[in-house]
Curated annotation (Swiss-Prot):
The lineage of its organism: Bacteria, Bacillati, Bacillota, Bacilli, Lactobacillales. It is a peripheral membrane protein. PROSITE patterns: ATPASE_ALPHA_BETA. The gene is atpD. The keyword Hydrolase does not apply. PANTHER family: ATP SYNTHASE (PTHR15184), ATP SYNTHASE SUBUNIT BETA, MITOCHONDRIAL (PTHR15184:SF71). This is ATP synthase subunit beta. It catalyses: ATP + H2O + 4 H(+)(in) = ADP + phosphate + 5 H(+)(out).
């Protein structure tokens, strides 16, 4: 192992000088430095640039407090490597693969894999046309997810991305029964803690590996923790031949961490101050999240949209990699419609008659047509009132409002806040319910009966309780 000395520390970026003639560490290699003689505190650095004359620029994976010039730095000779395999299930890791769940640490000889790898080649890839049922009406009807596909949940601050991803974990991980990997990237530690204890109580933790690099951690950790979670998922896919669910909350923080260190690494910022390598970094991560002939990875990624601006380079770059997009809309939260999924902006490659069937496709497109027409009529209603509409449009508006409310439902994970039990609605029930609303079967029921309910039978029961 070659060794060098710290030449400069600027926040999370550390320059390390190696003696001329020594072999320089390769890009992405992990370097180790101890802050005291007893070697009680270890800091891991990752090589990002070679500056020439034996100096490399590195990004710290932990806080650089305690580092001083002249400290010895050792080259490990390989990238950061993390534990993989069945032993990772039920455990919680940080970016370096160290356990953080207060239970027994992993043995030094446990199987490990480097976090930097190449994406699968074209001939290894496979595509699926099997629908992944989520039990959430608005998703299953209008923007269905594919098994082995990539899903993005887009939304601004506080519109319900994390609650939706937790409900998907609750519904899919429990129904699916396979292996799940949850990766928390730059989000709140409290949410990760809540999720861990909920999973422990429900028993899902036994089939889940969790990896966290939260908001309070340096940008190096937030930039690489997604790769740690992905490496664990890839092992289950490639070696064990499993179908894996990969949840990532939040992909935007991965980009944000990259932009934090980009200027310190000496790169010129590009649009909106992001790193010039934004598209490359996103591509390298996303191309590894894929399904191969050995096994599948179904990934569900929350993506924060800064200031609700979908043209921002970070969410715009992520769009290109996804099969399905679920867009959360602030206006719907203001109307009290949860989940606040925009039925017209959300889209899916799976919404075609060949994949979902003729009936489902016909109902979904008619629902979208009715909602689109309602949106067009809203300006007229705001200026002239409902009376100026034709009878046909009045009926359409009444049905559109019922559809809009029926797209909401109670979540299991929100039961402690709402006091209402959550509901899981099978796809067939969802399609039947919306078909009957479109046919006018429930035109006589009040709009409020359609709010936050499960299947259409719940609407009828609610209306009955209201005296209809």
């Amino acid at each position: 192992m070659s060794s060098g000395k710290i030449a400069q520390v600027v926040g999370p970026v550390v320059d390390v000088a190696f003696a001329t003639g020594d072999k320089l560490p390769e890009i992405n290699n992990a370097l180790v430095v101890y802050t005291d003689e007893e070697k009680s505190r270890r800091i891991v650095l990752e090589v990002a640039l070679e500056l020439g004359e034996g100096v490399v620029r590195t990004i710290a994976m932990e806080s650089t407090d305690g580092l001083t010039r002249g400290l010895e730095v050792l080259d490990t000779g390989r990238p950061i490597s993390v534990p993989v395999g069945k032993e990772t299930l039920g455990r919680v890791f940080n970016v370096l693969g160290d356990t953080i769940d207060m239970e027994a640490p992993f043995a030094d000889d446990a199987e490990r894999e480097p976090i930097h790898k190449k994406a699968p080649t074209f001939d290894e890839l496979s595509t699926s046309t099997e629908i992944l049922e989520t039990g959430i009406k608005v998703i299953d009807l209008l923007a269905p997810y594919l098994k082995g596909g990539k899903v993005g949940l887009f939304g601004g601050a506080g519109v319900g991305k994390t609650v939706l991803i937790q409900e998907l974990i609750h519904n899919i991980a429990q129904e699916h029964g396979g292996i799940s990997v949850f990766t928390g990237v730059g989000e709140r530690s409290r949410e990760g803690n809540d999720l861990y204890w909920e999973m422990k109580e429900s028993g899902v933790i036994e089939k889940t590996a969790m990896v966290f690099g939260q908001m309070n951690e340096p940008p190096g950790a937030r930039m690489r923790v997604a790769l740690t979670g992905l490496t664990i998922a890839e092992y289950f896919r490639d070696v064990e031949g499993q179908d894996v669910l990969l949840f990532i909350d939040n992909i935007f923080r991965f980009t944000q961490a990259g932009s934090e260190v980009s200027a310190l690494l000496g790169r010129m910022p590009s649009a909106v101050g992001y790193q010039p390598t934004l598209a490359t970094e996103m591509g390298q991560l996303q191309e590894r999240i894929t399904s191969t002939k050995k096994g599948s990875v179904t990934s569900i990624q929350a993506i924060y949209v800064p200031a609700d601006d979908y043209t921002d380079p970070a969410p715009a770059t992520a769009f290109a990699h996804l099969d399905s997009t679920t867009n959360l809309e602030r206006k719907l939260t203001q109307m009290g419609i949860y989940p606040a999924v925009d039925p017209l902006a959300s889209s899916s490659r799976a919404l075609s008659p060949e994949i979902v069937g003729e009936e489902h496709y016909a109902v979904a497109t008619e629902v979208q047509r009715v909602l689109q027409r309602y949106r067009e009529l809203q300006d007229i209603i705001a200026i002239l009132g409902m009376d100026e509409l034709s009878d046909e449009d009045k009926t359409l508006v009444a049905r559109a409002r019922r559809i809009q409310f029926f797209l909401s439902q109670n979540f299991n994970v929100a039961e402690q806040f709402t006091g209402q039990p959550g509901s899981y609605v099978p796809v067939a029930e969802t399609v039947r319910g919306f078909k009957e609303i479109l046919e006018g079967k429930y035109d006589n029921l009040p709009e409020d009966a359609f709010r936050s309910v499960g299947p259409i039978e719940d609407v009828v029961a609610k209306a009955k309780a209201m005296g209809y």
